[in-house]
Amino acid sequence: VNFLIRKGFDWDSARLGRPREVPIEVLLDRGIVLLDKEDGPTSHDVAATVKRMFEGTVVFKVGHGGTLDPAATGILPLLLNKAALVQDVILSSRKEYVGIMHLHGDVPEANVESMVKTFTGPIFQRPPDRSAVARVVRIRQIEQIDILEQVGRDVLLRVACEAGTYVRKLCVDIGEAIGCGAHLTELRRTRSGCFSESQGLVTLGEIGLAVAAWLDDGDETSLRRIVHPVERVFDCHPAIVVGARGSGGPLPRAIDTGTVIAASDSIENGTEVAVFDENGFILARATAAMPAAALIEAPGTVAAKIIKLYAGIGNLV
């Protein structure tokens, strides 16, 4: 993120990395684990297993940031204790998947590719029969869909889509449009919001070993490697940073420009932003009331209107 800095503020004095420096017990009370879910268990079962692994620690609650089918693999963000307060951010975020669509007949690659491309943009979807939600038709946005490889009747797809998109149903619909029928045989989630599989996913086994190393030997090295501060959820979000006047107590329903010391240069009027204090702790989500340059220059006026406060997560300085 590129920041515009308020004139006169010593940016070098800001400690935006402070959330990583908190005691391990505090990190566990507001942390996120990026699990590489394996084929087999449900997302609920995985969260329950991890909760048991953390017995003997401050962790009493483990949620997850978006259901993966039992047969699906890939990124499953796990939310420890207070991190559950940002679950809605992850659930509503953009997702990416790689999967294998098996065609029920022989179709030339060019024909498959041309039909697949027609599914880019808004599509109508009805959740599958076994879905936990009401089976009503809804619109979902397919941002990008690419054929990575086709071998015979097997088509390797990469799909970037809006949250709530059923990739299995998408493949069925593509098969019907082609005319031969199709179904999904393998699915892996490669991105969830700001998180991608290149960012160091961990296995259930690695979590267990890390917890044991800390409880048995007092070695928190591995645990700090696998547990991330809740602020990581907002890594790819436009942000504003407020000084002591903006974070030294409960935030009002709006943020005054006089408290803003830095703002992402991409911010425009109406942009949803993450609000941090100068130590890097998350304070709120808000809607910017002006572009970035004005945020750091305008005197005493509304800079952003609060969408959701994160006082429950805690400003720890």
Predicted regions mapped to residue ranges:
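RNA pseudouridine synthases
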Residues: 1-199
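Accessory RNA 3′-end/elbow-binding domains used by RNA modification enzymes
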Residues: 1-38, 43-65, 137, 177, ...
